[in-house]
UniProtKB/Swiss-Prot annotation:
Protein name: Methionine--tRNA ligase
Record text on subunit structure and interactions: Homodimer.
Organism: Chloroherpeton thalassium (strain ATCC 35110 / GB-78)
EC number: 6.1.1.10
Chief localisation class: cytoplasm
Catalytic activity: tRNA(Met) + L-methionine + ATP = L-methionyl-tRNA(Met) + AMP + diphosphate
Family to which the UniProt record says this protein belongs: Belongs to the class-I aminoacyl-tRNA synthetase family. MetG type 1 subfamily.
Function summary: Is required not only for elongation of protein synthesis but also for the initiation of all mRNA translation through initiator tRNA(fMet) aminoacylation.
Motif ('HIGH' region): 14-24
Chain ranges for the short sequence motif 'KMSKS' region as given in the UniProt record: 343-347
GO molecular function, one term: metal ion binding
Xref: InterPro entries: aa-tRNA-synth_I_CS, Anticodon_Met, Met-tRNA-synth_bsu_C, Met-tRNA_ligase_1, Met-tRNA_synth, Methionyl/Leucyl_tRNA_Synth, MetRS_core, MetRS_Zn
A GO CC term assigned to this protein in UniProt: cytosol
Length: 700
């Protein structure tokens, strides 16, 4: 028997600096909603908590660009995204926001409690400061000349022209974006969270879940732990955010870093939910009880924050505390969903936004298309043709066709009543092809296998459709009306089972089926009653009255319906290609001076195999590789951390300069150079020979 009496589900807080696109929905919000709806269907105590992440530099930059306050920006996108989620049937119990007073109070209380325990450290560092505006400047608020390509408009974190990642103090002639003045370097003090203090606890925590969590979560976490956890800044010099709740000059104009403040939004949002129930302390039952199971639905880019950093914050809060916060029990992190073979990208305007999609197509068609392509263990793809084919072939021709035929025939031939008793003997005679699906479906959802659950649900629909087609009640009724009545009694009970099984995936469609069957909403959702268990047996008795309603559940999507979307993609791709061509022309580096063949022969290029790979601490650019080079192994540092996870390079054959003089970087020696080329999107791709290249062999 489970140790848990209730489940608390959270979903990553979308950043309130733009609209949610289909990739976000597919990886995080839809699978969480399907899981939560299934738990409710079983009568379990479950709440779904979400909200908007409303602090950080990108929001202030957008506000500055538009000439409005950050609050105007976050209000716009919080409202747009929450409305789109609701329209798509994402059933949050509460959808909060990190700009709310409750959240600010919660985040400040956490900070003060951990500060009083002496866990934080403080460090003085130098940062650019605008004397005219009297503001410290984050990297994105500084512009200047790129030291690599000479672009005079490079940003303090990256040069958009050559793609080089920078820090603001590397820029030549830096200027403040606020005033255009030259900033000075000025000392500033910041608070740091010592993640290393919790290294052993986190190692034990991760290994304790190694058999139950997804491999991508375990691998990402182990990589960070293997590198050794260091101190991480939790404060910034910004005018927008949760104010550091301390008196004195040290804390003046400082806010909590968004990585620390955002995850606490799950707690503050739960507090707001409890207040809505008229029980302000009810949130404690979900956050401070060992009988609560906490689950974080996220994308793979958020693993470290939810598998390591948030647990570390809660561990710090729990030290010497009477009330103990629960730690996460599972982190079902998805891979990415791509769009027509390419990555979704808001910055490059290559995306389908949820609110725009729902203006043209029904929510349930989208929910099905995304759920059955859920990127559980690998990246998947959304395409308009696949969306059309699944809507027409599976939803319309299979599920919709069966339900409408069953309801229409009953209304026409049996006065809209269940015409016979569907006995348990008849029901059991359906065999393993029907009854075996219940266990498969339940186990899939309990273990977050959303695709498998969708396939199983559609198998139920195929079974029912085949049953009606092969039974041919429209023929049987002419000679054996009682047998036809038995067939239709079975078909209508199959309809109710389908309405229940599809309820987590297609909530709007499920409600329509129940309505046609004359099953009231009260009978569909009783607290504490396991409706999923009930529909494993027939529920509609002889004489039960249908509502008399009948409708086409899914309209087929014609080529003409999606052609505008395909045209839009073509325009997007053309614009991207033009932009990339212009960028390539702008960034084309002059050919270097001619060298002789003898000089070229001095360069020793070899095939090397990556044996180990990990991030270099305190930098977001470098990876440390251990490579096999023939009979020897070497350590090589490569600036590929922005483009590859360590796991992605493991076992990969790469091309390296084998006779380059060793060079010290970040206190480590790099014994060679891995070759890479920039692609059209400005991302570095490590050169990797095709075929079965021999490790250690020269490249010719």
């Amino acid at each position: 028997m489970s140790q848990y009496k209730r489940t608390l589900v959270t979903t990553a807080l979308p950043y309130a600096n733009g609209p949610v696109h289909l990739g976000h929905l597919a990886g995080v919000y839809l699978p969480a909603d399907i899981y939560v709806r299934f738990k409710r269907l079983k009568g379990e105590d479950v709440i779904h908590i979400g909200g908007s992440d409303e602090h950080g530099v990108p929001i202030t930059l957008t506000a500055d660009k538009e000439g409005v306050s950050p609050q105007v920006v976050v209000d716009r996108y919080h409202n747009r995204n929450s409305e789109a989620f609701a329209k798509c049937g994402i059933s949050f119990d509460h959808y909060g926001r990190t700009s709310s007073p409750v959240h600010h109070e919660t985040a400040q209380e956490f900070f003060l409690d951990i500060e009083k325990k002496g866990i934080f450290t403080k460090k003085v560092e130098k940062q650019f400061y605008d004397e005219e505006s009297r503001h410290f400047l984050s990297d994105r608020y500084v512009t200047g000349t790129c030291p690599v390509c000479g672009n005079p408009d490079a940003n303090g974190d990256q040069c958009e022209k050559c793609g080089t990642y920078l820090s603001a103090n590397e820029l030549i002639n830096p200027k403040s974006k606020l005033t255009g003045k030259t900033p000075i370097l000025k000392e500033t003090l910041h608070w740091y969270f010592p993640l290393g203090r919790f290294q052993k606890k986190l190692e034990d925590f991760i290994e304790g879940h190694a058999k139950t969590w997804r491999q991508n979560v375990i691998n990402y976490s182990r990589t960070w732990l293997r590198q050794g956890l260091g101190d991480r800044a939790i404060t910034r010099d910004l005018p927008w955010g949760v104010k550091v709740p301390l008196e004195g000059e040290e804390a003046k104009d400082k806010v909590l870093y968004v990585w620390f403040d955002a995850v606490l939004g799950y707690i503050s949002s739960t507090k707001e939910w409890a207040a809505k129930q008229g029980q302000p302390d009810l949130w404690k039952t979900y956050w401070q009880s060992p009988e609560t199971r906490l689950i974080h639905f996220i994308g793979k880019d958020n693993v470290v924050f939810h598998a390591l950093m948030f647990p570390a914050i809660l561990m710090a809060k729990n030290e010497n505390a009477d009330a103990q916060y629960v730690l996460v029990d599972n982190v079902p992190a998805s891979e990415f969903m791509n769009f027509e073979g390419k990555k979704f990208s808001k910055s490059r305007n290559y995306a389908v936004y949820l609110h725009e999609f729902l203006e043209k197509f029904p929510a349930d068609t989208l929910r099905y298309s995304l759920a059955i392509n859920y990127p559980e263990s690998r990246d998947t793809d959304f395409s308009w043709k696949d969306f059309q084919n699944r809507t027409n072939g599976e939803l319309a021709d299979t599920l919709g066709n069966f339900v409408k035929r069953a309801v229409d025939f009953t209304n026409s031939k049996f006065q809209g009543e269940v015409p016979a008793e569907c006995t348990i003997e008849d029901w059991n005679a359906l065999g393993e092809g029907w009854h075996g699906g219940f266990k498969k479906y339940e186990e899939a959802l309990e273990n977050f296998h959303i695709r498998e659950a969708c396939f199983t649900a559609m198998d139920f629909a195929r079974f029912a459709n085949r049953y009606l087609t092969e039974s041919e009640p429209w023929k049987v009724i002419k000679t054996e009306p009682e047998k036809a009545a038995k067939i239709m009694a079975m078909a209508l009970n199959l309809c109710e089972t389908l309405a229940t099984v599809f309820a987590p995936i297609l909530p709007e469609t499920s409600a329509k089926i129940f309505d046609m069957l004359g099953v009231s909403e009260a009978a569909q959702a009783k607290v504490g009653e396991n409706l999923f268990e009930k529909v494993k047996a027939p529920q509609l008795a002889k004489g039960h009255k249908l509502s008399g309603k009948s409708e086409i559940l899914f309209r087929k999507i014609e080529d003409a319906d999606i052609q505008p979307e395909l045209d839009k993609i073509a325009a997007m791709l053309a614009a991207l290609e033009q932009k990339e061509a212009e960028k390539a022309t702008e960034n084309f580096e002059p050919i270097k001076p001619t060298i002789t063949f003898d000089e070229f022969e001095k360069i020793d290029l070899r095939v090397a195999k990556v044996l180990e790979c990990e991030r270099v601490p305190k930098t977001d650019k470098l990876l440390r590789l251990k490579v096999q080079l023939g009979t020897e192994t070497r350590q090589v540092l490569a600036g590929l951390a922005k483009y590859y996870t360590p796991e992605a390079l493991l076992g990969k054959n790469v091309v390296m300069v084998a006779n380059l003089a060793p060079r010290k970087m970040r206190g480590m020696e790099s014994q060679g150079m891995v070759l890479a080329v920039e692609d059209a999107a400005g991302c570095l791709q490590a050169l990797s020979p095709e075929g079965d290249s021999i490790v250690g062999k020269p490249v010719k």
